[in-house]
């Protein structure tokens, strides 16, 4: 876990479109690390899960009830989601379900 923990919270609404970004380290980039955000030979799906917490600054995940809100796999051209993540320099966009509460 990176220290210190962040102190900022971003409020989001059900139905909002969000983007997540993956990298090997906080300062790695595809220009400095050819395997960033992930080795291009690592093929597979991408999934996003959420869990309800009292605060987005919660530091433990013990006992949380996780649920999947996004999954991307292999497309009709045979390209895996991780390949699209690699080609998009570590970024993936997804939409929060409209049926959940607004949150952080």
Where are the model-predicted features located?
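Structured recognition/catalytic domains enriched at protein termini
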Residues: 1-103
